From Swiss-Prot:
SUPFAM superfamilies: RNA-binding domain, RBD. The lineage of its organism: Eukaryota, Fungi, Dikarya, Ascomycota, Taphrinomycotina. Necessary for the splicing of pre-mRNA. The SF1-U2AF59-U2AF23 complex has a role in the recognition of the branch site (5'-UACUAAC-3'), the pyrimidine tract and the 3'-splice site at the 3'-end of introns. It comes from Schizosaccharomyces pombe (strain 972 / ATCC 24843). It is found in: Nucleus. GO terms for biological process: mRNA 3'-splice site recognition; mRNA cis splicing, via spliceosome; mRNA splicing, via spliceosome. This is Splicing factor U2AF 23 kDa subunit.
Amino acid sequence: MASHLASIYGTEQDKVNCSFYYKIGACRHGERCSRKHVKPNFSQTILCPNMYKNPIHEPNGKKFTQRELAEQFDAFYEDMFCEFSKYGEVEQLVVCDNVGDHLVGNVYVRFKYEESAQNAIDDLNSRWYSQRPVYAELSPVTDFREACCRQHETSECQRGGLCNFMHAKKPSPQLLRDLVLAQRKYLALNAAEEMKKEPNSDSTNRWVSVTAERKN
């Protein structure tokens, strides 16, 4: 019985726990959902809900060219990536372009380590971004391939922005490459600096002991 429950946990067969919350980290029913939304105590992934404001959804009526929209999003994505990377190595950053209340503007960040995610949560909830308070929570999402709408990837989604799966908004490929490379170099530099600060104590002890033996 226990193994069966474990095998269906978070799936559509699970009548107790919400499969959408488990896969997406958000559910259109919110607190009114008939199934449980089990918030994780530990996770590599954090969610900052409603953080991205797409200019085309703003009520000011201003029109933008596609180039302007792309440049604005690249600036936002770079800002997010650089800031989140201060807490630890970022493996994936996903920004939702959905318009449904539970997904609109959601920013998901998966770190390499759970400790980095927790550090981010502890700090971000006392900060502001673009004149608005930041809200951050641990998310159960670990596999964005399951969370993202596959039809949207091929421009075939019939539900548009109201889809209940993530419509991930992509930065320019060059920007993403630059950010990943910059993070890799930064981590390598930090690792090299740490090695300089902390000499291998075991190696030092071995040399001392050998020297002592020779003297004897």
